[in-house]
């Protein structure tokens, strides 16, 4: 739509990535966050005059950005225009710099950022999640550079994933699972490790904890999650569970039951689109795109009461196509509510 020859989704991602690049210091480390110290804010964000402060550099932020930069470098470098390819090279160097900082500072891994001076959420990752984020970063860096250093990292660390420790596939483990699968399908991956990853994933998703719930019709809306998984951001959890079934099909891990996996995945898509207890399409403002009852407003500071993005029918409402958080029986307002 922007007319620059690049998909708009990639333009949006590039805008975010350029901000993340500003968070990286010359050392390769990345600041944990940049935020106001309280819950203040305004809409649109470009009019917000509040002072913002950097948190310190942390291993968790550096690890996460390392993987994001490497993944984005692969995508950007594959575009046909010179600007995207140049940006891809910049992202690759940023990923390499982040990895080099991590290698040079093993004593700072994992990080335990305490959010000192801020009221907003700290968003520190658990040590296990930092480990899995780095595994995924290694998988993308191996694909990007073909350097066996990153292959060896995955080979030596993959069994620490819950996929192997607990024989567990979960929508809460997508960081680890997506990294492992990305590595497993790479032609340069160590064959024994690749085979172990694909077998472990297949055996779990084809079993009672995943396909079994679909076959038993344990959810009348065909989008099963356990009660405890209906929490903050449950629509994301639903979508990732559906993706687990799609991976079984797209990777050909159990071809004899491929129609079942596709049907199971569709259940989660239909749930998002309106086949759910409240009969709502959980995407915002989709009236012009075929939805009869899409979300007319959403709880977000940028689309707050009194703004032109407040509610469809009263004002313009939120932009089309945003996925709202979803059902959450444990919801309680935090400091940003007021």
Describe these PLM feature segments:
Residues 89, 93-100, 104-107, 111:
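Hydrophobic, small-residue-rich alpha-helical packing segments that form membrane-like cores
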Residues 159-167:
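Solenoid-like repeat scaffolds
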Residues 81, 108-112, 122-124:
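Flexible helix-coil transition and linker loops at the boundaries of alpha-helical arrays
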Residues 1, 6, 18, 33-75, ...:
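Aromatic (Trp/Tyr) and acidic
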Residues 24-34, 107-111, 146-149:
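Proline-centered turn/helix-capping motifs that create local helix->coil transitions or kinks
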Residues 74-80, 85-91:
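N-terminal module-boundary/linker segments of secreted carbohydrate-active enzymes
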Residues 25, 31-35, 78, 114, ...:
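Short, solvent-exposed loop/turn and secondary-structure capping segments
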Residues 7-29:
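Carboxylate/His-rich catalytic cores and anion/metal-binding grooves
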């Amino acid at each position: 739509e922007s007319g620059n020859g690049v998909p708009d989704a990639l333009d949006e991602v590039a805008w975010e990535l350029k901000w993340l690049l500003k968070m990286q210091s010359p050392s390769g480390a990345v600041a944990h966050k940049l935020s106001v110290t309280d819950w203040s804010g305004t809409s649109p964000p470009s009019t917000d005059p509040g002072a913002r402060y950097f948190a310190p550099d942390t291993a968790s932020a550096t690890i996460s950005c390392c993987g994001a930069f490497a993944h984005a470098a692969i995508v950007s470098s594959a575009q046909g225009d010179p600007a995207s390819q140049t940006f891809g090279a910049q992202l690759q160097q940023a990923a390499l710099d982040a990895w080099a900082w991590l290698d040079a500072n093993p004593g700072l891994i994992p990080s335990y950022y305490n959010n000192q001076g801020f009221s907003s959420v700290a968003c520190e990752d658990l040590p296990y999640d930092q480990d899995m984020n780095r595994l995924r970063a290694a998988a993308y860096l191996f694909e990007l550079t073909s350097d066996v250093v990153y292959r060896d990292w995955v080979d030596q660390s993959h069994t620490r994933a819950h996929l192997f420790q607990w024989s567990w596939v979960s929508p809460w483990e997508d960081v680890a699972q997506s990294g492992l699968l990305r590595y497993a399908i790479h032609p340069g991956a160590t064959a024994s490790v690749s085979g172990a990853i694909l077998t472990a994933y297949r055996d779990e998703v084809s079993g009672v904890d995943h396909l079994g719930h679909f076959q038993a019709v344990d959810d009348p809306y065909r989008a099963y999650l356990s009660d405890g998984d209906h929490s903050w951001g449950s629509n994301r959890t639903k979508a990732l569970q559906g993706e687990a079934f799609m991976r079984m099909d797209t990777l050909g891990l159990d071809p004899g039951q491929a129609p079942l996996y596709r049907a199971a995945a569709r259940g989660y898509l239909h749930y998002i689109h309106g086949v759910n207890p409240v009969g709502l399409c959980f995407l915002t403002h989709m009236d012009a795109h075929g939805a009869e009852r899409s979300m007319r407003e959403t709880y977000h500071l940028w689309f707050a009461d009194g703004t032109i993005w407040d509610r469809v029918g009263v004002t313009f409402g939120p932009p089309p196509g945003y996925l709202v958080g979803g059902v959450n029986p444990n919801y309680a307002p935090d400091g940003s509510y007021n």
